[in-house]
Curated annotation (Swiss-Prot):
Transmembrane segments: none
Annotated residues for binding of substrate: R276, R312, Y316, E343, Y370
Pfam family, one: Orn_Arg_deC_N
The organism of origin for this protein: Pseudomonas aeruginosa (strain ATCC 15692 / DSM 22644 / CIP 104116 / JCM 14847 / LMG 12228 / 1C / PRS 101 / PAO1)
Family: Belongs to the Orn/Lys/Arg decarboxylase class-II family. LysA subfamily.
Subunit description: Homodimer.
Binding residues annotated for pyridoxal 5'-phosphate, in chain numbering: G239, E273, P274, G275, R276, Y370
Protein name listed in UniProt: Diaminopimelate decarboxylase
InterPro entries cross-referenced by the UniProt entry: Ala_racemase/Decarboxylase_C (IPR009006), DAP_deCOOHase_LysA (IPR002986), De-COase2_C (IPR022643), De-COase2_N (IPR022644), De-COase2_pyr-phos_BS (IPR022653), Orn/DAP/Arg_de-COase (IPR000183), PLP-binding_barrel (IPR029066)
Source superkingdom: Bacteria
Pathway assignment: Amino-acid biosynthesis; L-lysine biosynthesis via DAP pathway; L-lysine from DL-2,6-diaminopimelate: step 1/1
Lineage of source species: Bacteria, Pseudomonadati, Pseudomonadota, Gammaproteobacteria, Pseudomonadales
Enzyme class: lyase
């Protein structure tokens, strides 16, 4: 479903004109659709109906409290990688018993806080982490539920920066070492083994890597059962891709159906950690044209959003669709859309055919995931506002940063 559509030659988010949002909240502004978020979550939950499951939204994709609250109200779980993300989930009304704690660098404080609030499990990524968790749990006099993140050595066929399931990646425990680590976990009196986890990458557009990883994990589950180590849940992580341009990723329902067909009656709770597929196409970055600059070699549309607001094009060479909020009936020109940051790499899109004038509003599509969460204050620029649209209602779920807030935590040297 696409909740961003044109009505009377103007782009709307659900029932609200984007021009109205720009007038009220300014630009640049991230705009999210509640209806899209809910529909994408339900696509997972509905496909898993009739079997024990947990759909844990990957907070790293979009950690805004308003977005998290929408998902918490639906009964979602959450996949976190830091104490900060845990506190966000709690503040948004999330159930800690539905939280899985991933990440390669959990500190002792991270572990203590997660044990205090009672997370569902820790996705342990190394033998060293396992031993630390045992010590922290012993200090608190509790048992820590653990699932080992296993690296199945599967090529996710995605951008190398977001491929996480190969031997050379920093994530997880190599599958040929996993049985020994599980045996050690079973010996430790303050740990309880409950599952196996993997996450092979992000923005996957084919089922084959997922199914390859699944077969390897099921083989591991069977071998562990033969050694008396029971696995109760199978966490297949996230990674399902979305359409940015012309990709044709599988639908969540087709993906889950293929997984269920291969379980062959095993009594396992299925856990998924979707992020991008829930929120990417639920959001746009709304920006305004400041200048049109024409040179001998290039035409530039200089907009008020920049790489500090949306770094995906510069960092990943990601293609983002750009639409005029009010398209002009004029001959287009080919523009690079660039921001005010003092780097050549500050661009949102290149070689786009658009009919533009100074002051026009543009919507950078598919910006709901890894957009605001990766933003910065580079060039001492305040981060954008965030607005959540619900039907014909708009809610400012994060106000724009002021200049004074950018240095509020700093101080001068004493005289």
């Amino acid at each position: 479903m696409d909740t961003f559509s044109y009505r009377d030659a103007e782009l709307f988010a659900e029932g609200v004109a984007l021009s109205r949002i720009a007038e009220r909240f300014g630009t640049p502004t991230y705009v999210y659709s509640r209806a899209h978020i809910e529909a994408q979550y339900r696509a997972y939950a509905d496909a898993l109906a009739g079997m024990p499951h947990l759909v844990c939204f990957a907070v790293k994709a979009n950690s805004n409290l308003g977005v998290l609250n929408v998902l918490a109200r639906l009964g979602a779980g959450f996949d976190i990688v830091s104490r900060g993300e845990l506190e966000r989930v709690l503040a948004a009304g999330g159930d800690p018993a539905k939280v899985v704690f991933s990440g390669v660098g959990k500190t002792r404080d991270d572990m203590r806080r997660a044990l205090e609030v009672g997370v569902h499990c820790f996705n342990v990524e190394s033998g060293e982490e396992l031993e630390r968790l045992q010590r922290v749990a012993a200090e608190l006099g509790v048992k820590a539920p653990v699932s080992l993140r296993v690296n199945p050595d599967v090529d996710a066929q995605t951008h190398p920066y977001i491929s996480t399931g190969l031997k050379e990646n920093k994530f997880g425990i190599a599958i040929d070492e996993a049985e020994a680590v599980y045996a050690r976990a079973a010996e430790l009196d303050h740990l309880e083994v409950i599952g196996v986890d993997c996450h092979i990458g992000s923005q996957l557009t084919q089922l084959e890597p997922f199914l390859d990883a699944l077969e390897r994990l099921l083989g591991l589950v069977d071998r562990l059962a033969g050694k008396g180590i029971g696995i109760r849940h199978l966490d297949l992580g996230g990674g399902l891709g979305v359409r940015y341009r012309d990709e044709q990723p599988p639908l969540a329902g087709d993906y889950i159906r293929a997984i269920r067909e291969r379980l062959h009656g095993r009594d396992l709770t299925l856990v998924f950690e979707p992020g991008r597929s829930i929120v990417a196409n639920a959001g746009v970055l709304l920006t305004r044209v400041e200048y049109l600059k024409h040179t001998e070699h290039k035409d530039f549309a200089i907009v008020d959003a920049a790489m500090n607001d949306l770094i995906r094009p510069a960092l990943y060479q990601a293609w983002m669709d750009v639409q005029a909020v009010r398209p002009r009936d004029a001959a287009p020109r080919r523009y690079d859309l660039v921001g005010p940051i003092c780097e050549t790499g500050d661009f949102l899109a290149k070689d786009r055919d658009l009919a533009l004038a100074e002051g026009d509003l543009l919507a950078v599509r598919s910006a709901g995931a890894y957009g605001f969460v990766m933003s910065s204050n580079y060039n001492t620029r305040g981060r954008a506002a965030e607005v959540l649209v619900d039907g014909e209602q708009t809610h400012e779920v994060r106000r724009r940063e002021t200049v004074q807030e950018l240095y509020a935590g700093e101080s001068l040297l004493p005289q």
